[in-house]
C-alpha cells in the first residue's frame, strides 16, 4: 500500500473519540484509520488505569534526584538482595527471536522501515523515541507505516530516484520502541490532561497489529518491544501490568508480549535483576544503551564536582565504569536466561574518503569483536552498510543463535558498586567543548524541523548525543573546569562558552551553506541550547524542555462527519 496524503480542511472533520478523549492534532483521513474510537478507547483505558502509578514513579525519580544532589550516590538496594541472590529465570525466549545477532535501528519513517526490514539484520527496532522528533505528523505517520509493514503492504515511491521500495520475502523481526515514561503526548488529552506518550505509542500499535504480527512475525508470540529510559524496577512493574492488561484485552496468552529493556540510566544498572524479575514473563533481555548511559552519569552526578567527565569522545567502553556496566549486564542476563544485547555502532560509511572509511569500519569491527568475546548475544547498527561487519563479528558464536547457555558464566557479584561508579579518566579540551556545542546545536535544529535521526560528522546521531553534549557543557561551565590541550590553564566560563558559541555558529553556517542555514532553525536552536547549557539548574531532558516548540494544536470546535 502506498501512503496516502490528504489536505486538512479546518472546521470540517474531527476524530471519532470516546468520552473524555480529545484529539488536538491535525485531522487526516489516513490518521483516522489509526485513531479509531475503539483504539482511542483502549489508550484511554491504559491511561486511566496506570496514570497514578506513572505519577508516583516520576515523583520517586524527583526524590532520588534530590538525594543525589545532596551528596548520595546510587547503589544496590539491600531490600531486594533476595531477588539478586535468587535462582529464578525468565520465561524461555520465543524461537522467533532466539537469533538477534545484529539489530538495525531507526525512526518509524516509511522508506527507513522498508530498508531496515530488508537490510539482512535479524531485528529492526522501529523507534518512536530518541531517533524521532515527536511531532504529530511523525507519530501518526509512523503508526500508519508500521501497520502497513506488519500486514506486508508497505511500499514507498521515491519519485526523485524513480524507484519503488517494497518488502523482500525475508525480513527482519520487528521490535518497536515507544517513548519513555516521562514524555507526554500533548496532542491527545484524556480527561483534560495530556496522555502519557509511551501509552499512546504502545496502545495504538498494539491495538491495530497484535493479531497480524503474531501470525506473520511472532510464531504465536508478540508483538515485541524495546523499553527505554527506566530508572527503577517499579517502572518495569508498570510496563508488566500494561502488557498483562493488553493481553487480557486481546484475549491472548499471558507472556505473549515480549520486551527488551535498555539499561541506559545509571540508577538502572543497580536494578537489572529487579527489572528482569518484574518482567520475567515478558522479558527477552537487556541492552547496553551506552550513549544515554553516559548522559545519565553526568545528570546523576550534576552536584558532584569531583565526578567531572573528560571529553565525551574519550568515554568509551574502555573506561572501567563502562566495561563494568557491560560485564554486569551480560552476567545478569545469562543467569536469568535472556539476551544481553550490545551497544550502538553509529558510524556511517564515508563514501568520498576510502581511507577514512576503512579506519571507521575497522573501529566498528574491533568494537563488535569485543562485544561478542565479552559475551553479548547481539549488537546494534545504525546503518545497513555496517550489518555485514557486525554479522561477521558475531559469527564467532558458531552455529549458536546466542550465547545465553554457551558462554562461561561469571559471578555477577564480583562487580562492585565501586566498579560501576569509578570516575572516568581523560583530558578536557577546548575542542571537546566546541564539538559538544557544534553537534548539540545542529542536532536540535534538525529535531525542531522534524528530524530525530541526524547524520553529523560521519555518525548517525540521535537525541542521546545532544543530551550528552548539553549536560557536559553545563557541568564544565558550572564548575569552571580547567582545560587541557590547546586551552591549557583556561577555565570554562559563561564568557568563554559565549565566544565558542559565536565561532561554532559561524563554522556551522560555512559547513551547511548560507541558504540552508538561513532556511533552517539554527539560530532558534542556538538560543535554546545556550540557555540549557548556562541555566542555573539542569533540566532533566532536553527533548522535554523544548517539546512545546513542536506541538501544534488544531481547532476542536469542528462538526463531526
UniProtKB/Swiss-Prot annotation:
Pfam family, one: MS_C
Major localisation: other
GO terms of molecular function: malate synthase activity
Active site: residue positions: 177, 462
BP-aspect Gene Ontology terms: glyoxylate cycle; tricarboxylic acid cycle
Pathway recorded for this protein: Carbohydrate metabolism; glyoxylate cycle; (S)-malate from isocitrate: step 2/2
Top EC category: transferase
Residue span of motif Microbody targeting signal: 559-561
Alphabetized SUPFAM superfamilies for the sequence: Malate synthase G
Locations listed in the record: Glyoxysome
Cellular component, GO annotation: glyoxysome
Superkingdom, natural source: Eukaryota
Catalytic activity: glyoxylate + acetyl-CoA + H2O = (S)-malate + CoA + H(+)
EC number: 2.3.3.9
Keywords: Glyoxylate bypass, Glyoxysome, Peroxisome, Transferase, Tricarboxylic acid cycle
PANTHER family: MALATE SYNTHASE (PTHR42902), MALATE SYNTHASE 1-RELATED (PTHR42902:SF1)
Family named by the database record: Belongs to the malate synthase family.
Protein name: Malate synthase, glyoxysomal
Organism: Brassica napus
Lineage: Eukaryota, Viridiplantae, Streptophyta, Embryophyta, Tracheophyta
